[in-house]
Amino acid sequence: KNSVYHSKNQVNALPIINLEYNRFYLKGYKPGFIFYKESDFNFSAIVDPIGGYSDFAIRKSQFKDGYKNLESRNTQVMGGIALDFKIDKNIDGHSEVVFGNHGTKVNIKLNRAYKVNDRVTFIPAVTFNYYNSKYMDYYIGIKEKDIQNNSKIEKTYKGKDTIAGGVSATLDMAMTEQTSFLVFGGIDIYDKKIKNSDIVRTNN
């Protein structure tokens, strides 16, 4: 993915495993438990074991020269509530609010599946994310010591509540009844205020 930071672009790989047993499930890499269910929506308790992985987490070794003495922005274990719902027979929605030691994130996603043939499904989606100030301060905040230790950082920055919107597309190719190969691509546009952090590139 293209990094929001002054860093090398990152290659992220994740196993996507979908399992269900009674009210327990694993979707992608997030386990959950459905505690309330109706025909067109359900509520779950969920855990994100690698919160931040898909947006702001980064190892210090990935920063470019002039930023290499920054500390890593690590993933975090987050937990919260998820809502899965149907707007109509074609459009599915997912929303979650998760909390961690380094802040809170809200996600809303709407997608629609188009069956290309018996084995291939095309799934476009739109997303909305909200990150609270604590979350953003951990990932893109800058302290005085960061200025002293990194030649290209000129000012401190305190993270602020931030929103982002995005579009994505997934191509789901069924290999067997139990196994699929997924190709995913997308773009996210962040609130312009994050550009006030010297560690963030200005073209996000």
Report residues per predicted region:
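Predominantly the C-terminal beta-signal and adjacent terminal strand-loop region
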Residues: 172-204
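A conserved mid-domain beta-alpha-beta active-site/ligand-binding segment of alpha/beta enzyme cores
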Residues: 149-174, 179, 185
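Short glycine/proline- and aromatic-enriched beta-strand/turn motifs that initiate or cap beta-hairpins
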Residues: 1-26, 32, 134
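Residue-level detection of beta-strand scaffold positions
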Residues: 16, 46, 127, 182-184
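Short, solvent-exposed loop/turn segments at secondary-structure boundaries
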Residues: 4-8, 96, 196-198
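Outer-membrane beta-barrel "beta-signal"
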Residues: 14-18, 110, 204
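Outer-membrane pore/translocation modules
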Residues: 27-111, 115-123, 127, 133-159, ...
